[in-house]
């Protein structure tokens, strides 16, 4: 099987050659933006929403993107098509789109011309998600690290930027909590209100209603917005945005993480303690299950069984955080 190829700033190159230049603004400042997109049955899911957010992030950070939305969509499809032998039936794609302002002008003498960096990479989703399948059996244990969410007054959280250091610090802290096999970090803000996970949004169910944190201090995740804008109306579930703290989480009916890879992942514990005795045997509460089932129906894939199958195929018990941090 030949090597996968990556679209890298106007060229198609082997993935092994697709490095970030040492003088790129991302290397110096974490000055870049990105999007992660997945497929269902090898069709991109809400790709247009992700690209819209990419343009909003680029506009805020004044990162030039020289391509139109239509051109980017076509490039995404071409990236998958050029790598189709790596995506047999039953496999899905995790698409990574990255943009930066490119090499810093002070190093322009090194280059024939300085231009913005733009990368699209297609990676088998099962390899990314293989450590996540057991969460659908056990539920996630949300563990709160010392590391807080960076407040929007210091860094705009609605921008999906590559500056992920505070997330990684939280991951490192939480990975030391007992076993990292079933834990997920849950960040709170400087006022003690729940913000988000390090790679997913957090939602709780209270009195039959979907409750999300206020949207001012977190990334407006595409998956969370799909629940809010599409699934909730379809299921006639009311959505409330409000500040809530760990006390509220400990007394809610159900909870979940939601993000591109996991779609929806049930959370039944907070700092090792079950938030509801009814979630001990089955981490899916009735509303969480209803949302998950409707999601699967809409996309034509039982994503929960898909994730379980990928996990079973690995034959490993490696935790989610281990896949991000390696051996500490």
Descriptions of predicted regions:
Residues 1-67, 71-78, 82, 106-328:
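Helix-start/capping segments and mature chain N-termini
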């Amino acid at each position: 099987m030949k090597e996968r190829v990556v679209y890298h700033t106007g060229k198609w190159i082997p993935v092994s050659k697709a490095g970030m230049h040492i003088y790129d603004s991302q290397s110096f400042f974490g000055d870049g933006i990105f999007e992660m997109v997945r497929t269902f049955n090898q069709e991109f899911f809400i790709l247009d929403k992700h690209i819209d957010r990419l343009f909003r992030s680029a506009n805020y950070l004044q990162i030039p993107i020289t391509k139109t939305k239509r051109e980017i969509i076509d490039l995404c499809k071409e990236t998958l098509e050029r790598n189709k032998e790596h995506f047999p039936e039953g496999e899905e794609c995790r698409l990574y789109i990255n943009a930066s302002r490119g090499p810093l002008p002070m190093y322009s003498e090194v280059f024939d011309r300085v231009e913005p960096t733009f990368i699209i990479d297609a990676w088998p989703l099962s390899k990314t998600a293989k450590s996540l399948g057991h969460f659908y059996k056990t539920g996630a244990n949300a563990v709160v690290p010392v590391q807080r969410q960076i407040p929007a007054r210091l860094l705009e959280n609605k921008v999906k930027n590559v500056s992920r250091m505070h997330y990684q610090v939280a991951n490192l802290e939480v990975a030391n909590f007992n076993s990292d096999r079933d834990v997920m970090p849950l960040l709170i803000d400087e006022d003690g209100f729940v913000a988000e996970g390090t790679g997913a949004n957090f939602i709780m169910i209270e009195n039959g209603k979907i409750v999300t944190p206020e949207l001012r201090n977190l990334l407006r995740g595409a998956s969370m917005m799909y629940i809010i804008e599409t699934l909730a109306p379809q299921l006639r579930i009311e959505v409330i945005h409000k500040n809530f703290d760990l006390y509220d989480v400990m007394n809610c009916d159900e909870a979940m993480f939601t993000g591109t890879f996991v779609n929806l992942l049930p959370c039944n514990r907070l700092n090792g303690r079950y938030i509801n005795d009814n979630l001990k045997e089955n981490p899916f509460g009735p509303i969480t299950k209803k949302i998950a089932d409707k999601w699967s129906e809409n996309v034509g894939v039982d994503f929960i069984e898909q994730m379980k199958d990928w996990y079973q195929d690995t034959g490993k018990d490696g935790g989610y955080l281990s896949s991000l941090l390696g051996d500490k």
